[in-house]
Design a protein with these regions (language model features):
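Short, charge-patterned binding micro-sites
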Residues: 41-52
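Short, flexible active-site loops
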Residues: 59, 83-89, 100-102, 121-125
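Ordered, amphipathic secondary-structure segments that act as subunit-interaction surfaces
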Residues: 66-99
Length: 221
């Protein structure tokens, strides 16, 4: 199997689109060799813990309402092409995602990581839920099969806060400046929301190489 490390943030629309495109390719190639692991990268690491009003934040970031609309036009187009429903009007808060990344980390310990990542994307982009809010995160985790009592206990503590920050910082030190970023076998990097056709080509090339290696090994024995 081949490790596919994915650096992502659950409030990043390109990450949602990138995941959707990747999984469309994986569904077409059920024999794909990938084992997925999700890693933290905060788009807004300095966001206050309670988040900020999304409209005010975006208008400040992009120089007014028209600038924000222009900046998000390619996102809307790409989301439609991916078959996604993203309701930006329903999103009221831009949250700090540190606690969401803690949840993703804990989900990985139970092999529920991708399920939780998808649930976070849907909660934020389709339902407008505040995924910086701990009760909301606990509900999402429970909906993915995690234990409520365990999540209550973990979120009441500082468990893994510094670990998430350190992993985010390590990614930046390695040159990651945006997400999604996909790292194949700790060697090859793909940046951005790549189309499913490209992922299909990558999968086929890897499978071909693995088959060649298997043939060489069989010949050698």
């Amino acid at each position: 199997m081949i490790k596919l490390d994915i650096l992502s943030d659950p409030i990043c629309p390109w990450c949602h689109i990138g995941k959707t495109n990747l999984f469309r390719a994986l569904q077409k190639h059920p024999d794909h060799p990938f084992v997925l692991e999700w890693h933290p990268f905060q788009l807004n690491p300095d966001m206050p813990e309670g988040g900020r009003d999304r409209r005010a934040y975006l208008e400040e970031k992009f120089g007014g309402k028209e600038g924000a609309v222009r900046a998000y036009a390619p996102v809307v187009e790409a989301a439609e092409a991916a078959g996604l429903t993203i309701d930006f009007e329903v999103i009221k808060v831009t949250p700090n995602t540190l606690d969401a990344h803690r949840l993703i980390h804990w989900a990985g310990l139970e092999e529920k990581q991708t399920h939780v990542v998808q649930a976070l994307f849907e909660a934020y982009f389709e339902q407008g839920r505040d995924i910086g809010d701990i009760p909301t995160l606990i509900d999402i985790g429970v909906g993915c099969g995690m234990e409520r009592e365990m999540l209550d206990r973990l979120f009441a503590s500082d468990a893994d806060r510094e670990d998430i920050r350190a992993r985010d910082a390590h990614a930046r030190e390695r040159g990651v400046s945006g997400v999604p970023t996909f790292v194949i076998a700790n060697q090859h990097v793909l940046r951005g929301a790549q189309p499913p056709e490209l992922w299909g080509q990558v999968i086929e090339e890897i499978l071909e190489e693995l088959n060649k290696q298997a043939g060489s090994d069989a010949t050698a024995t």
